[in-house]
Each structure stands twice: as C-alpha cells, then as structure tokens.
Amino acid sequence: MFSENIGNDYIVIQEGTSEGTQVKYKKDGYWYKKDNRGNEGRAEYLVSKFMQFTTLQENEFISYEEGTINGKSGCRSKNFLDEEEELVTFYRLYYNEVGKDLSKVIANMNTMEERIEYVIRFIDQSCGLNIHAYLSKVLTLDMICLNEDRHLNNLALIMRGNDFYCLLYTSPSPRDGA
C-alpha cells in the first residue's frame, strides 16, 4: 500500500460520472484517484488483481495499487501513456468528428444491438479499428465485476500520431472524461 500527499496543483480532472465525481491527480509517473463513496480504490485494485489470473495479456489492462491520498483511501496506477500518446474517449472522438453528443444520438436508436453496432461502425470508419474484441472484453469484465457505470466517457482508444489502439482497463479511472 502507498501513502501519498499530493497538492492541488497535481489535480488533472474532476469530472462526474453517473456514480459521482472523484478527484484525480497525475504526479511522478502515476495517476491517483481518491475514493468518493469509499472502496472504489479497493474495487479497482481487486479487479486488476483478478485480471492477472485471466487469459488477458499484461499490456491489455492497467494494474492498480490501493493506498491513501492525502489521508483518504484511493488507488493509483502507473502512467500508461507514452509522451506521444493521448487517450481519446469514444464520446470525445465522436464529438470532434461529428460535432454531436454520441450518447444522445444512440439514445434515439431502438435496440441495444443497434447502438453497439453504430458505435463499432463509427470507430471502424473513423480510426480503421475493429473494436469487437475490445468491447467484448470490457463488457464481460463489467458483467463479472458488476460495473454498472460503463459509458462513452470511459470507453477509450489510445492515439499515437494517426494510429489508434485499444487498452482494456478496469474502470473509468483515471481517464474518465479525458
């Protein structure tokens, strides 16, 4: 377990999800997230430990440590992005490309299958990336871990130059809202 005191100058983002807002920091090669409701950090740590015992490769997910941040429970992960990489959420990619809110667009579709296929088709057309396997892994993990907070701001691609690739990670943190 770690214990870290971090000043407000390291705060990266304070964005809400349907489960609430959590303070996120980036310092010395780590991303930190303080618990908001209690035990979110422990959940992320346990899920990342669980993933070590699956058939996933180490480069497909983020490992978390649990600890304390400014005396409050939370978690941290090593920064998973290289200098020339950027995390782009599905929401932001769609907004940048189309100028509309992807969640509102798919909310008007009749079935979940239509919504998923629309997103898959958009990512393929925009990035040349087939995300079927990625979504299958993320949604399977969500089902196993009872994650009910999956949305378009915590599904993301890593962009390096003009290339995109997927990384399975355990939860919205610390990239939520990126």
Please report, for each region that a protein language model flagged, where it lies by residue.
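Hydrophobic, aromatic-enriched interface-forming segments
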Residues: L135-L168
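Active-site catalytic microenvironments for nucleophilic, acid-base chemistry
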Residues: F50-T54, I158, S173
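Conserved ATP-binding subdomain of kinase catalytic cores across diverse folds
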Residues: M1-G99
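Short, well-structured alpha-helical interface segments that form or flank functional binding sites
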Residues: R42, L46, N130, R150-L152, ...
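Short, charged/polar micro-motifs that form catalytic or ligand-binding hotspots
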Residues: K34-G41, N130, Y134, L141, ...
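ATP-dependent phospho-/nucleotidyl transfer catalytic cores
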Residues: F80-L139
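Single conserved hydrophobic/aromatic residue that forms the stacking wall/gate
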Residues: Y169-A178
